[in-house]
Design a protein with these regions (language model features):
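Long, compositionally biased non-active-site segments enriched in small/hydrophobic residues and glycine
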Residues: 1-188
Length: 188
């Protein structure tokens, strides 16, 4: 009954783009697969502390007999579609990966939760859509809110210093009134 969504994945470019519905389907399916494999292989006493990595999940799935594998993949795919419908509604065009309630980046100022609203408005950084995950280049973590990643990056041309590039997210200044407070954040 979810064949149309599987067909979308077959035609997908395999990029976890922030504007991709297929990326949203894939990431939710991956999450359901990992959760199901955790239930199956991690002892109850250790579940609070351990989770299987994708590489291990793929390895274990590849070693299953064909019927068990089909059952697992169908079950988790269907549950991923159910979860997406529950969270975002029946229309698949609402399942875009990079959105506020899915994959995004929101850096919180350390004082944001303790200051009044007028100061919070000055220091708070915006939320931006994000693509990728912890298994893609740029390693943006598997959290739906990117909480980690390379925020300081530098390419130095020692033969011509003026030809060097650097970025420091969210910006080069700690002063919220400066134009350089968050000028590098959106591109990060």
């Amino acid at each position: 009954n979810n064949i149309e969504y599987f067909s979308m994945l077959e035609k997908w470019d395999k990029k976890l783009s922030k504007s991709s519905v297929e990326a949203g389907i894939y990431v939710e399916w991956q999450s359901q697969l990992i959760n199901e494999m955790n239930k199956k292989f991690i002892p109850e006493i250790a579940k609070e502390y351990l989770s299987m990595q994708l590489f291990t999940v793929i390895d274990k799935i590849s070693k299953m007999n064909i019927d068990e594998r089909k059952e697992l993949l169908n079950k988790t795919f269907n549950s991923s579609i159910d979860k997406l419908k529950e969270k975002f509604g029946d229309r698949s065009d609402n399942w875009v990966y990079g959105q506020k309630d899915f994959k995004h980046v929101k850096i919180y100022h350390p004082l944001e939760k303790v200051v009044n609203d007028s100061i919070k408005e000055i220091i708070a950084l915006k939320l931006y859509p994000r693509g990728g995950d912890g298994y893609t280049p740029g390693s943006t973590s598997n959290s739906l809110n990117q909480e980690s990643g390379g925020s300081f990056r530098v390419i130095i041309d020692t033969g011509n210093w003026d030809n060097s590039f650097a970025t420091n997210s969210p910006g080069q200044s700690g002063d919220p009134n400066s134009e350089f407070y968050d000028n590098l954040y959106e591109d990060w």
